[in-house]
Each structure stands twice: as structure tokens, then as C-alpha cells.
Amino acid sequence: MTHASILILAGEASGDYHAAALVRDIKQRSPHIRILGIGGEKLADAGMELLHHYREINMIGLSGGLATIRNIIAAYRTMKRELRSGRHHLFIPVDFPDVNMRLCRVARTAGLRVCYYISPQVWAWRRGRVRKLAKLVDRMMTIFPFEQELYREACVDAYFVGHTIVRDIPEPIDRAAARKQLNIGDNEYVVALLPGSRPPEVRRMLPMMCEAAEIFAAQFSDTRFVLPLAGGHLEPLVRDIASNYQVNVKLIHGEAASVMAAADCGLVCSGTATLQAALTCMPHAVVYKVDPLTWWIGRRIVEEDVHLAIANMLAIEAEKQGGPIKEIQDAGFQIRCRECGRPLFVPELLQKSATPEELAQWLVSFRTNESLRRAMVRGFHQIRAMLAPPKNGPTAAEIVLGLLESHPSREQ
């Protein structure tokens, strides 16, 4: 369709990141397609017309206030008006299910095709949403392979299209180049500290990490600790916390993937950074801690078989064929979930087990046990292969363009 029009809603930074890659691919194949909606700088740079910035709709909470609520209502009304305008052919909601599932209903009523990109994490909590989505979408494009079968069992036309991060962190990992870029010596032993991207996370995680670094440095004095800042606004907080510990931490603005590529091992707060750590082949432990009430509520909402490290979710899926967990076991190690006892690939130190002593012990293991290191690296290569786009399947852009071709034409 030469003059087709697509609406997109990406309500947070991760959605902006994934959707921008999709828009670039669509524009490369069909530059005349008009794409507009809600997103951020990455989507705008990729060629999407911004109706609103995602910051206007994802800041509700104690700090949001009435102004933010008004912005959310205005953005929602804008999308409803556009969906009902008759000017567009396809709606692509990107994650952000609380808003996007409502807009899917509007799109369906208006006669638009719906192609959901980045599945809501129904495998983690509220699995009943799968049945609702089956009635709302024409296609579901997933970024984790285990999601495709979950949706197809519910009669959703789902396709695993690969994870964007695989394209952004290419193989092979050039550790020497990463170190040169960051001005780190070839012979230095480097530990990466990634305490999260939000101030509350940093306040909880960084003191533990710094104390673990002190313990480790007392045994291995040649260690260099490096911390990539997720944003410049975090620097005063990070410096203030780090100043309380007898350890020198080199701060680097951004460049998280480069820091992990340069590091020998690391400690990582849960989130996207755990995938970056896996794809840069950095042995690491995942650490997370919240207040007891939040943890208690979370354990009753989230499914029992869900783990914070996506690498563990993927490794469990591959367990029957061997996979990353077997690599660890063959190296003589047993990494288990403290909650359910299940064998894991990457250690997860959560709540009571998230102590400086436990963190330091894993850093020691990564440094002193070469068999463990090699097993983890082999497992990371398998994780990458699982996240890569299927060789014989359609790409996300091809799925979108196929839906446009099958849509009844409208006058522009």
C-alpha cells in the first residue's frame, strides 16, 4: 500500500527502543508509509511523527500530580480520535498493556487491523490476559521464543521475531576494542557494577555492591570497578553512596554494553541489563531487593516459575535439550533458585540472599574458577542463539507489511 498509514503507541523507553528498530525496517522497505503515534526520541529519529512523548503517559504515581493525569487523558483521547478517524490502516501497540489493551478494543471497533509488538508479560502474571488478547489482535509479535507457543495455544496468530538487542550487540564480542574505547588496560581485572536505572533501585542496590566490592578488593587488590551511569541525573547519588566505601569506582556515562563487554565479570540489577550481560558474555550474578511488603505482594501476583533473569527463563526452556544449565552442571557447579529449588543458569540473589558476602563470593568464583567462566560463556552463546530472529520465519517488518497488503484499501 503506497499511501498506508500506521499508528503506534510505545508508552515507555523500552518500547521506544524496540519500535524504533521496527519503524526503520518498515521505512527501508516502504518509505512512503506514514507512521505516527506516541513514543520517544528513538521513534522520532526513525521517522515516526510524534503526537505525544511517552513521558506524558508513563509518569503517573505519587509524583505525577494532576498535570500528569491531564496529559495522560489528553494523549489517550488523541489516540482514540486517530483510531476512529478512518485515516489509518493498522495499529501497532508496543507492550504497555494497561493502556494498549484498551486502545486495541477501540481499534477493533473502528475496523483497524491490530499487530501487537512486544507481548505483555502474561507468562509472568495475569495469564488470563492471553484469552482477552486473542479477541483483540490480528497478529502478536514476540521477542522471546517461549511466548510464541503460549499464545498459539490460545489461538493467537503469534510469531517470534527475535530480540532487538541481538542486532545491537553483534558477535563476536571485541573485549580489547571495548577496553580501548573506555581507556581500560588490557591486563586489568575489571568488575562491572550495574545497580539499576532508577534512583530507588540505586539506593537499595549500590551500597550492597560497594560493600561486596570492598570484600573482593581486599582479596584481589588489582581489581578495577566500573559503573555505567544510566543517566547523568544519577551521578550525584552514585558518587554520594560510593564515597562511603573504601573502593574506587570508575563512572562512565552510558555505554553499558561496552562496559560489560570490557568487564571480566559483574553484578547486575534485574532488568534489560541482565540480557546485555548475557549477550556480551559477561559472567554475572543478578541481584534484587525491595521492601518486605512489596516482595510479599509480588510473590503472590507473579507466577512461581518466573525468574528475574531472562537468561534463566530461556535456560529453563532449553533444559530438556541440555542447554546453558547443563553447561554449568558439567562444570561441577549447582546454581539453584532459593525460592523454588529449581536449577538455574545465572545466580539470582534476591531479598535475604542479597548480601554483600554472597555477592563477593560469586565474584570470587567468577575469578578463580575457569571452568565456571567457560561454562557460562558457552551458555551465553546459546542464549544469543535462542534470541536471534528465526532464519526461516518472517521479520517483524514483513509481518506488518503483510497485514497492510491484506487490509481493505481506504482513501487517504
Model-derived regions: residue spans:
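Nucleotide-activated sugar donor-binding and catalytic core shared by glycosyltransferases
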Residues: M1-Q412
